[in-house]
Curated annotation (Swiss-Prot):
Keyword terms, alphabetized: Phosphoprotein
Region (Disordered): 36-69, 97-132
Protein name, as recorded: Uncharacterized protein YJR012C
Presence of keyword S-adenosyl-L-methionine: no
């Protein structure tokens, strides 16, 4: 036996031919398990790269045509889509946009109006030096 517990090639052949146990090798019995003991896999097999692309394309095709049922009666649908109701919604939206733009202008004016507390902060006053 060589140093470090390793067998030379000739020693390994001698162990194999004479059916001697080989050091540092675990004997594993040749046992076949009963198929009835096998459990069912909980994970499905991973798709191969080319299969994944095919499934992705088929899912996109099915997503293009969703089957959605709406629980809306005809009267409420007509009420939501009537021209007067739509014009009211647009009117409210335009008023909100005007209010938002007014608030934005007020915010800008408030930022510019910061001063010493006088109301005349926006007015420009030039001081004339007095002669002595």
């Amino acid at each position: 036996m060589a140093a470090g517990g390793e067998l030379s090639y000739e020693e390994l052949l001698d162990h194999i031919l004479n059916n001697k146990p080989i050091p540092n090798i675990v004997e594993v019995p040749n046992v076949t398990l009963d198929e009835g003991l096998a459990s069912t896999p909980s994970l499905r097999p991973r798709p191969r790269p080319w299969e994944g692309q095919l499934q992705h394309q088929s899912h996109q095709g099915s997503l293009d045509k969703p089957n959605i049922s709406l629980d809306i009666d005809q009267e409420s649908l007509e009420g939501m889509t009537s021209l007067t109701r739509l014009s009211e919604c647009y009117d409210i939206q335009s008023k909100l946009q005007i209010n938002d733009s007014d608030n934005d202008n007020d915010d800008n004016n408030n930022d510019n109006n910061k001063g010493d507390g006088n109301d005349d902060d926006n007015n420009t006053v030039t001081a004339n030096p007095t002669a002595r």
